[in-house]
From Swiss-Prot:
Protein name: Na(+)/H(+) antiporter NhaB
One cellular component (GO) term of this entry: plasma membrane
Organism classification: Bacteria, Pseudomonadati, Pseudomonadota, Gammaproteobacteria, Vibrionales
Membrane disposition: Multi-pass membrane protein
Any one Gene Ontology molecular-function term assigned to this protein's record: sodium:proton antiporter activity
InterPro entries (alphabetical): Na+/H+_antiporter_NhaB (IPR004671)
Classification via PANTHER family: NA(+)_H(+) ANTIPORTER NHAB, TRANSPORTER ARSB-RELATED
The family this protein is said to belong to: Belongs to the NhaB Na(+)/H(+) (TC 2.A.34) antiporter family.
Cellular compartments annotated: Cell inner membrane
Catalytic activity, reaction form: 2 Na(+)(in) + 3 H(+)(out) = 2 Na(+)(out) + 3 H(+)(in)
Regions crossing the membrane: 13-33, 34-54, 64-84, 90-110, 113-133, 136-156, 205-225, 234-254, 306-326, 351-371, 378-400, 450-470, 481-501
Length: 530
């Protein structure tokens, strides 16, 4: 039976999203103008924020760009904010957009080196505890200098590759032949137990790597997009950012590694599964074959990528240019010295990051509404009436709770804008601002590991082709993240409460930090002029 034109429009709207979700989004779009014009713009603004958080929380039903974008377009259309204000937010955060566009694409052309490193780690270390720590440490180190999304993309590529190699053999086929590894129809009965254990083994490594991106990502200004936003508003460079965060991030890092060891040793929350010996033998044989087939051309590419990695770290550490521009140099160097010159091949590098970049532009549209409607002003004003550590603690908790259900880039951007406005208006001192910026950064990065909604890298894992292969569902991901969530959130809170102020004072006394003056303050004042 032919479908009517009206039903066709409904079916096409938001694609494969459930009908109840489509109806909900349409309801939001109908209700918002009435609330804005007939009730109160302030209430309408908060309603929009809740609706947008809902689209982020339901990211597995529909990617948030479309429903969130429709809400943002309507908000501009009815006057909740203006196109000029949205543009202002985008221009103010151009470095973040450049990071996502160029840095992620740049690392795409270094995947060969990263795949090589992770492969050697996976095969070379037999102890599961040491292997888990290695994956966590490697992901943390890489995320301190690269975008976490990129690091996870590499880990996913490695994991899919190794999964498919064994799946072929378990299905009675040669590893070099083409094979559909998404179905277990041809898996031999004797191999099924090994396959299930292998899935569990890969799940645990993937989660350790994911947590590693959070542990390393919180430490530096380039580890997460919101870090760059916060550093930009505070006028901090690469080294100062690391030092200011260290009273919280170093204890969290150590406790995170301890948690990694304990969950593996005591097999807590789905961890502790060993790599089956049959699987190891197949993987080692495959790696030996790959090594034999590797030519000088391949080794030349690996050498070039290693040298580019050194340039990347030096460029970031010395702040030689905006992070995104350093990413652009990586693209140019990597493609020049590995022979990638076709436009089509270049285009593939941008596929991973551009959807999230577009979503970030929508974030900033919602932030523009929050600023124009003064939505967070009452909350910020109340918190700023608190004394001493209570201010930092409340900011950490508020950021942490919201980051568990919403994207931490969105949360961090909102709070740092409000605190910046308080600084420019003379409500708080520059030293207070620096302390609150640390609380906001750690609050958005650490508790957000609780759910895939908070961390873009986690959501990327859950929506990837790998998740169904290794049976990694939303619920299982939350369950496996639970030990880390508890430890990271509580140790971070303790760091804010007991260590941040005394350690920062010690850094001042040692001359590692200097009290920022009005000269630094003036660098952030223009961005706050709304």
């Amino acid at each position: 039976m032919a479908i009517s034109l009206g039903n066709a429009f409904i079916k096409n709207f938001l694609g494969k999203a459930p009908d109840w979700y489509k109806i909900t989004i349409i309801s939001f779009l109908i209700i918002n103008p009435f609330v804005f014009f007939l009730v109160d713009p302030f209430v309408a603004g908060w309603l929009l924020v809740v609706e947008f958080i809902f689209t982020l929380a339901m990211a597995l039903k529909c990617y948030p760009l479309q429903p969130g974008g429709l809400l943002a377009i309507e908000a501009v259309a009815i006057g909740m904010t203006s196109p000029a204000q949205v543009k202002h937010e985008l221009v103010a955060n151009i470095e973040v957009l450049l990071l996502l566009i160029f840095m992620v694409a740049g690392i795409y052309f270094m995947k060969q080196l990263l795949l090589y490193i992770f492969t050697k780690i996976l095969i070379g270390i037999r102890s599961k505890v040491l292997l888990s720590l290695s994956f966590c440490l490697m992901a943390a180190f890489l995320s301190a200098f690269l975008d976490a999304l990129t690091v996870i993309a590499v880990v996913i590529s490695v994991t899919v590759g190794f999964y498919s190699i064994y799946h072929k053999v378990a299905s009675g086929q040669d590893p070099s032949t083409s094979h559909d590894h998404t179905t277990d129809t041809h898996v031999r009965e004797v191999s099924r137990d090994d396959l299930e254990n292998y899935r569990s083994f890969l799940r645990s490594l993937l989660m350790h790597a994911g947590i590693g991106t959070a542990l390393g990502g919180v430490m530096t200004m380039v580890g997460e997009p919101q870090n760059l936003i916060i550093a930009d508003q505070a006028g901090w460079l690469f080294g100062e950012f690391i030092i200011r965060m260290s009273p919280v991030t170093v204890p969290v890092f150590m406790c995170g590694l301890l948690t990694c060891t304990l969950v593996e040793k005591f097999q807590i929350c789905g961890y502790g599964t060993l790599l089956p010996e049959n699987v190891r033998r197949i993987l080692v044989d495959y790696d030996d074959e790959e090594r034999k087939n590797r030519t000088n051309i391949d080794y030349a590419k690996l050498t070039a990528q290693a040298l580019i990695a050194v340039w990347l770290i030096v460029g970031l550490a010395m702040h030689l240019a905006a992070v995104g521009l350093i990413g652009l140099t990586v693209i140019i160097f990597a493609t020049s010295f590995t022979g990638v010159t076709e436009e089509h091949a270049l285009g593939k590098a941008f596929e991973e990051a551009l959807p999230f970049t577009a979503l970030l532009a929508v974030f900033f549209s919602i932030v523009a509404v929050i600023i124009d409607q003064h939505l967070f002003t009452p909350i910020i004003s109340w918190v700023l009436t608190l004394n001493g550590n209570a201010q930092m603690t409340m900011f950490y908790i508020a950021n942490g709770l919201l980051s568990m259900v919403s994207d931490n880039v969105f949360v961090g951007t909102v709070y740092i804008n409000e605190v910046k406005a308080a600084l420019v208006n003379g409500v708080i001192t520059r030293d207070q601002f620096d302390m609150l910026a640390v609380a906001i950064n750690t609050g958005t990065n650490l508790p957000s590991v609780a759910t895939p909604n908070g961390q873009a890298a986690f959501l990327f894992v859950l929506t990837s082709a790998l998740a169904p292969l290794i049976r990694l569902s939303y619920g299982r991901m939350v369950y496996m993240a639970l030990p880390y969530t508890i430890v990271l959130a509580l140790v971070g809170l303790a760091g804010i409460e007991f260590m941040l102020l005394p350690m920062t004072e010690w850094f001042y006394d040692m001359g590692w930090l200097v009290h920022n003056t009005s000269e630094v303050m003036s660098t952030i004042a223009p961005a706050a002029g709304h």
